């Protein structure tokens, strides 16, 4: 069994925010798997399905981003999913919009959701699908990060979203079918 986690903030007001791209990808994967988030446990919405021939547990933590580790750790422990079979899909400021990257382990890069997961799992070696959202530019860019991640994609960016989410789903399915190295070699080089 694989555990696929989409990071985001709960609530309709956050639904289309850049910070919620993890939820958006999980929703698309659920459609591909003909599954749904039909349970509430581990302080998360949870559903099971089959993707690329493998049983998958889908999780969308319903805590806010900085507490999402609790949901991930509880689900992984309950279903006895090894950390190497946990994929966390999250927004990534350090990648430009349109760039997707798979990687195993690493630090949190300042991402509070990842910090929480690392702390709760006690292990940073889980797989990440980093979905580039770009970052604010210009004067006071650092101070504007919070407003930026909690903003909606603009019209031009929204037009790109379907293709990017499709690519994220393809990356996820290849990771399930053929492993991380194959998926990284195929997709991480593409812009």
Swiss-Prot record:
Reaction(s) catalysed (UniProt annotation): an N-acyl-L-alpha-aminoacyl-tRNA + H2O = an N-acyl-L-amino acid + a tRNA + H(+)
Database matches in InterPro entries: Pept_tRNA_hydro (IPR001328), Pept_tRNA_hydro_CS (IPR018171), Pept_tRNA_hydro_sf (IPR036416)
Site (Discriminates between blocked and unblocked aminoacyl-tRNA): 9
Subcellular location: Cytoplasm
UniProt GO cellular component terms: cytoplasm
Catalytic residues of the enzyme: 19 (proton acceptor)
GO terms under biological process: protein quality control for misfolded or incompletely synthesized proteins; rescue of stalled ribosome
Family matches, as Pfam families: Pept_tRNA_hydro (PF01195)
Residues in the signal sequence: none
UniProt EC number: 3.1.1.29
UniProt GO molecular function: peptidyl-tRNA hydrolase activity; tRNA binding
Keyword line: Cytoplasm, Hydrolase, RNA-binding, tRNA-binding
Positions marked as site (Stabilizes the basic form of H active site to accept a proton): 91
Chief site of localization: cytoplasm
Residues that coordinate or bind tRNA: 14, 64, 66, 112
PANTHER family for the chain: PEPTIDYL-TRNA HYDROLASE
Purpose: Hydrolyzes ribosome-free peptidyl-tRNAs (with 1 or more amino acids incorporated), which drop off the ribosome during protein synthesis, or as a result of ribosome stalling.
HAMAP family to which the protein is assigned, alphabetical: Pept_tRNA_hydro_bact (MF_00083)
Family the entry assigns: Belongs to the PTH family.
Subunit architecture: Monomer.
Protein name (database record): Peptidyl-tRNA hydrolase
């Amino acid at each position: 069994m694989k555990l696929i986690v989409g990071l985001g903030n709960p609530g309709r007001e956050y639904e289309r925010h850049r910070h919620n791209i993890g939820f958006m990808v999980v929703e698309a994967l659920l459609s591909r798997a003909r599954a749904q988030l039909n349970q509430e446990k581990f302080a998360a919405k949870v559903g099971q399905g089959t993707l690329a021939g493998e049983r998958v547990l889908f999780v969308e933590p319903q805590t806010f981003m900085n507490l999402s580790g609790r949901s991930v750790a509880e689900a992984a422990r309950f279903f006895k999913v090894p950390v190497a079979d946990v994929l966390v899909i999250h927004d990534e400021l350090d990648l430009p919009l349109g760039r997707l990257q798979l990687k195993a382990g690493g630090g949190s890069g300042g991402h509070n959701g990842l910090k929480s997961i690392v702390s709760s799992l006690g292990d940073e070696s889980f797989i990440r699908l980093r979905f580039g959202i770009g970052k604010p530019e210009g004067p006071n860019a650092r101070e504007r990060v919070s407003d930026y991640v909690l903003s909606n994609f603009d019209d031009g960016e929204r037009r790109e979203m379907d293709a990017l989410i499709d690519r994220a789903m393809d990356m996820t399915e290849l990771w399930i079918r053929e492993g991380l190295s194959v998926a990284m070699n195929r997709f991480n080089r593409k812009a």
